[in-house]
Amino acid sequence: MLRISKLTDYATVLLAALSAQPQALHSASGLADRTGIGAATVSKLLKELHRAGLVSSTRGARGGYQLARPPAHISAAEIIDAVEGPVALTECAIHGGHCELEPTCGVGLSWQRVSRALRSALEGLSLADLMDHDARVRAPNLRAALDAGWQPLTRV
């Protein structure tokens, strides 16, 4: 079964939480509380998302995290790449020449074509697109917090 990892799903939830108030700085602990994702997992994912250029961070007592780009400019492919590595269905779709079966394989090129089509579809799907469908179902803790008047850390 093809499926993204739970960590990629969590990373997407965190990015959606950051996009709720894009100008604000969000603490890792605050994001953990609001999303229901464990604090250690949130910290790990924020580091990976920062390394990939999807979030920016500000250090210090008034620091925190925010999206590095608008949600419409962050693709699903970039999110998956940040957490799981390159999108590909088979090893040869990423690293041609590293498979012992390659000399006799009759399907490698077809899988590469499928991987390219999948990657293209994911590149055409933005974080904004992912958040466009009923956010209450996908991130109930975040929505409840926003509805209750929660305000993240803001720059002073």
Feature map (PLM): residue ranges:
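A short alpha-helical element within helix-turn-helix/winged-helix DNA-binding domains
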Residues: 26-36
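Alpha-helical residues within the helix-turn-helix
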Residues: 33, 50-51
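Short coil turns linking two alpha-helices in DNA-binding domains
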Residues: 38-41
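Beta-hairpin "wing" of winged helix-turn-helix
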Residues: 53-68
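Conserved segment of winged-helix/HTH DNA-binding domains
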Residues: 71-96, 107-117
